[in-house]
From Swiss-Prot:
Keyword Iron on entry: no
Protein role: A translational regulator that binds mRNA to regulate translation initiation and/or mRNA stability. Usually binds in the 5'-UTR at or near the Shine-Dalgarno sequence preventing ribosome-binding, thus repressing translation. Its main target seems to be the major flagellin gene, while its function is anatagonized by FliW.
Name this protein carries in UniProt: Translational regulator CsrA
InterPro entries with a match to the protein in the record: CsrA, CsrA_sf
Organism per entry: Magnetococcus marinus (strain ATCC BAA-1437 / JCM 17883 / MC-1)
Family designation: Belongs to the CsrA/RsmA family.
Region (Disordered): 58-77
Amino acid sequence: MLILTRRVGESLHIGDDIKITLLGIKGNQVRIGIDAPRDVEVHREEIYDRIRRETRKANRRTAEETLDQASRLLSQK
């Protein structure tokens, strides 16, 4: 993990397209601004974790449905 120190108003870049700026500090909270292309998804960790869980559930359901359909097709022959 790369650890950097920034002051309010300072930025860092990830690649050519992503810029992260430290906007402010209030107590134990830090406000950051993220400038990234629209095709780059940016999520808070708790939202990202929820998306991953829901995607896994959906993939499991899809796999189960596919197996059920294949089983029905095979039993018809």
